[in-house]
Curated annotation (Swiss-Prot):
InterPro entries, A to Z: ARM-like, ARM-type_fold, PUM-HD, Pumilio_RNA-bd, Pumilio_RNA-bd_rpt
GO cellular component: cytoplasm; nucleus
UniProt keyword RNA-binding, yes or no: yes
UniProt protein name: Pumilio homolog 12
CDD domains named among the record's database cross-references: Pumilio (cd07920)
Location relative to the cell: Cytoplasm; Nucleus
Residue stretches of each Pumilio repeat: 277-312, 313-348, 349-388, 389-424, 425-460, 461-496, 497-532, 533-570
Pfam families per UniProt: PUF
Keywords: Cytoplasm, Nucleus, Repeat, RNA-binding, Translation regulation
A biological process term (GO) from this entry: regulation of translation
Gene: APUM12
Species this chain originates from: Arabidopsis thaliana
């Protein structure tokens, strides 16, 4: 008994000496792990240093033996299979993480029988498994599975090929695209394809052998890979080919990637060396970024025959191209090099339908092309047609973010032809346009380009609505523009419209600017009347402490003179205590001290 206990202690000490060797990483066999069984040339084998399977099994099984694990055979309904496609570093069959006596390799099995750990086991072994547990005198033989990696690869390849054929049967137009691979000139199409290697032959966690999926290694040890990949995850999910751009293809991505490669087919224009090669395809080139630039280079050569050929192919689509992100640039270039007859055809084409020119002018791309038409129009007939097409939607055009630029270009290039209908629209819809973000800009342009009676009527209409416009975020700019025209009659009319409301107007954001402009540009008589109204109205203290009103008082101090200035200073001093405790009041006191 003592001798037996001594032997067990010796074996336990031996086991303690064995365990550090298993986990230290020093005694690992040097063997490569292949990321894929594919025949692709881009597959790289990376050396992995893994612990020997036999070392793990022997050490931990013996630990179970000596630490009181019950001597019985766990029940398992599954027979033992050894997958020949994967071997451990020592070329022994893989041993699974679950301790099952019927999953032990033959050497370990006999060793456990010798120490009495597996008594009477022969009755639980099936006849098919007895070949793995032979007596010592007979050599071991491995069960060789009839299924090889090549069979698995071929099966996966055929399944993926069938999916592709089904997809192509639903989308027959892709068959033509595939045939382009055999054409000498292959720059017609550019689409992303899966690598030419058989990526469908990679290890898949769903289709692979169930026994292979159960194999596991300590992830911490597997992280010692020389690659920048988590090797444990690569083994678990299957690894694939590393493509030319460095992307790692995994098996569970292949079907999706193939579908994406078919769906992402994108038609690219053919590259042409001369305009003759592009005959019949000008319309499509005009709508492509590179094709449009190619055609513009042809225009730069100013060859009449080439211009005529391009013109004839796009004239029927001219309105569409004018609103195209790339085509509009070609139309602009065409208008610079075409002759008068061709330009007239373009004008007729874009005005043949009512409202078509308005639609193009309001388009973010079309507005540039229409402006170019306005700039290049020379004949009175052309100008008349353009004006007739624009006049019915002029108010909408003026208020549009893109269309207002066309109207401004008309004022710049088509006067006096367009003056009448433009100024009439401005006068009739003065308040509507003046209070619009874009309309106020066009109205100021109209004031700048108008002359004589037209200008007088327009200014008078604006001045008569001065009180309303002064309080509008956009109308106040139109009113200030009228002040800057320095028309005395217009200034007096505006001052009369605002009189009696200066205190209220001074404490509003928009109208306070108008009051400052009045103090600056009014004559001494009207300036004095404004200041007296501010003092005598009884709310000067509120105006001085107001975020906007304090600027009006500062302007009054700066522009006033004589008795009016003295009255204003005295009124300010009466509120000096409240001004000192208010940030806006301090600004008034600062202006008062600087005036001295």
């Amino acid at each position: 008994m003592d001798q037996r206990r001594g032997n067990e202690l010796d074996e336990f000490e031996k086991l303690l000496g064995e365990i550090p060797k298993v986990t230290s990483g020093n005694d690992y066999n040097h063997f490569p792990i292949c990321l894929s069984s594919s025949r692709s040339q881009s597959i790289k084998k990376v050396d992995q240093y893994l612990p020997d399977d036999r070392a793990f099994t022997t050490s931990f099984s013996e630990a179970n033996l000596h630490f009181g694990i019950p001597n019985h055979t766990p029940e398992s309904p599954h027979p033992l299979f050894i997958n020949p496609s994967y071997h451990s570093p020592s070329n022994s069959p893989c041993v699974y993480d679950k301790f099952d006596s019927r999953k032990l390799d033959p050497v370990m099995f006999r060793k456990l029988q010798q120490v009495g750990y597996l008594p009477n086991l022969s009755s639980g072994i099936s006849p098919a498994q007895r070949q793995h547990y032979l007596p010592h005198s007979q050599p071991l033989s491995h069960y060789q599975s009839p299924m090889t990696w090549r069979d698995i690869e071929e099966e996966n390849f055929q399944r993926l090929k069938l999916q592709e054929e089904q997809y192509l049967s639903i989308n027959p137009h892709f068959l033509h695209l595939q045939s382009m691979d055999t054409v000498p000139r292959q720059d017609h199409f550019d689409y992303r394809r899966a690598e030419q290697s058989n990526r469908n032959l990679f290890w898949n966690g769903e289709d692979g052998n169930e026994s292979v999926r159960k194999m596991c290694y300590p992830e911490k040890i597997l992280m010692r890979s020389q690659m920048d990949l988590n090797t444990a995850k690569v083994i678990k999910y299957g690894a694939g080919d590393e493509s030319q751009n460095g992307r790692l293809w995994l098996q569970n991505q292949l079907n999706e990637d193939l579908t994406m490669s078919l769906n992402n087919l994108s038609l690219q224009p053919q590259k042409y060396n001369s305009i003759a090669e592009a005959r019949g395809k000008i319309y499509y080139l005009a709508k492509d970024q590179h094709g449009c630039r190619f055609l513009q280079r042809i225009f730069s050569e100013k060859d009449g025959n080439d211009i005529e050929m391009i013109f004839n192919e796009i004239i029927d689509y001219i309105s569409e191209l004018m609103m195209d992100p790339f085509g509009n640039y070609l139309v602009q270039k065409l208008l610079e090099v075409c002759n008068e007859d061709q330009r007239m055809q373009i004008v007729h084409s874009i005005t043949r339908k009512p409202g078509l020119l308005i639609k193009i002018s309001c388009d973010m791309h079309g507005t540039r092309a229409v402006q170019k038409i306005v700039e290049t129009a020379k004949r009175e007939e052309e100008i008349s047609i353009i004006i007739s097409a624009l006049k019915h939607g002029i108010v909408h055009l003026i208020k549009n973010v893109n269309g207002n630029h066309v109207v401004q270009r008309c004022l710049q290039y088509l006067l006096p032809y367009c003056g009448k209908f433009l100024f009439e629209a401005a006068i009739t819809h003065c308040v509507e346009l003046a209070t619009d973000r874009h309309g106020c800009c066009v109205l100021q342009k109209c004031l700048g380009y108008s002359e004589g009676e037209q200008k007088q009527h327009l200014v008078s209409e604006i001045a008569s609505n001065a009180l309303l416009l002064s309080q509008d975020p956009f109308g106040n700019y139109v009113l200030q523009y009228v002040f800057e025209l320095q028309l005395q009659w217009a200034t007096f009319e505006i001052l009369e419209q605002l009189e009696g409301n200066y205190t209220e107007l001074s404490m509003q954001k928009c109208s306070s600017n108008v009051v400052e402009k009045c103090l600056k540009l009014a004559d001494d008589k009207h300036r004095a009347r404004i200041i007296r109204e501010l003092i005598n109205y009884g709310r000067l203290d509120q105006v001085m402490l107001d975020p906007y009103g304090n600027y009006v008082i500062q302007a009054a101090l700066k522009q006033s003179k004589g008795n009016v200035h003295a009255l204003l200073v005295d009124a300010i001093k009466l509120n000096i205590s409240s001004l000192r405790t208010n940030p806006y009041g301090k600004k008034v006191l600062s202006a008062l001290s600087s005036k001295k």
